[in-house]
From Swiss-Prot:
SUPFAM superfamilies: Adenine nucleotide alpha hydrolases-like. It comes from Oceanobacillus iheyensis (strain DSM 14371 / CIP 107618 / JCM 11309 / KCTC 3954 / HTE831). This is NH(3)-dependent NAD(+) synthetase. Homodimer. Catalyzes the ATP-dependent amidation of deamido-NAD to form NAD. Uses ammonia as a nitrogen source. HAMAP family: NadE_ammonia_dep (MF_00193). The gene is nadE. Belongs to the NAD synthetase family.
Length: 275
């Protein structure tokens, strides 16, 4: 194992093995503790895509608010699951299945197409050409903007689905899906998240679904693994301290070094990590 691989594993707090039921309990308790500390808040908001990560975090969050309501004999605490399509979402059935599994306190739908298209048009009017890839970033940021608007209206915190297998590659939009108040899945790799969903009796098709950010119009439902040039299995093996093929290792470490700026806050005169 290289020194960089060791550093990455330590920085991302990845364990080679987990007890799924214990991880569920630990992360539910984390969500509960944060709300109990911040008494002005009523709960959490998260966009639900119908994929593994948002389904897992949504379920953990709903468990947390249900327990808080029961423990305090109230119905004040809530989880707001948001459907955030751009026009017509091709895998909308998966979102609906995730909602049935989670049973959120509240479900809101905000179609981001009009807002995204307006931003692209305004930028074009200013002489700024937005590529299809950059338009994908506009979609991610518009989704997060909508979540923060809803969170503000309901005195909630915004959750993010960032986990170790995503963080190591920086595979998210800066100030888009990478923005949040809490990231309760941090430290888990992809297969560990799947193990937790199995323990939660989640429908199999939701955690066996091929991961995709689905942000590009020209390449709809582009698989994450194709975009990254490495598989999640290889990423998980790397994060668990196992040996992986040298080309895969170089790809993962290359992503990590290139995306350091995404994992750090705004750079000040006193920061040294970038030098």
């Amino acid at each position: 194992m290289s020194d960089l691989q060791k550093t990455i594993i330590e920085d991302l707090h990845v364990e080679p093995e987990i007890d799924p039921k214990q991880e569920i309990r630990t992360r539910v308790d984390f969500l509960k503790s944060y709300l109990k500390k911040h008494t002005f808040s009523t709960g959490y908001v998260l966009g639900m895509s119908g994929g593994q990560d948002s389904t897992l975090l949504s379920k953990l969050t709903q468990i947390a608010v249900n327990e808080l309501n029961e423990e305090n004999s109230t119905n004040t605490y809530q989880f707001i699951g948001m459907k955030l399509p751009y026009g017509v979402q091709k895998d909308a059935d998966d979102v609906d299945d995730a909602i049935k599994f989670v049973e959120p306190s509240k479900v809101l739908t905000v179609n981001i197409k009009e807002s995204v298209d307006a931003s692209v048009k305004a930028l074009d009017g200013a002489g700024v050409e937005i590529s299809d890839f950059l338009k994908g970033n506009e979609k991610a940021r518009e989704r997060m903007k909508a979540q923060y608007s809803v969170a503000g209206a309901f005195n909630c915190f915004v959750l993010g689905t960032d986990h170790a297998a995503e963080a190591v590659t920086g595979f998210y939009t800066k100030h888009g899906d990478g923005a949040c108040d809490l990231a309760p899945l941090f430290g888990l790799n992809k297969r560990q998240g799947k193990q937790m969903l199995v323990a939660l009796n989640c429908p199999e098709h939701l955690y066996n679904k091929k991961p995709t950010a689905d942000l590009e119009d020209d390449r709809p439902a582009l698989p994450d693994e194709e975009a990254l040039g490495v598989t999640y299995e290889q990423i998980d093996e790397f994060l668990e301290g196992k040996e992986v093929a040298e080309d895969s290792k170089r790809t993962i470490e290359g992503h990590y070094l290139k995306t350091m700026h995404k994992r750090e806050g705004e750079v000040t005169l006193y920061d040294q990590w970038w030098k």
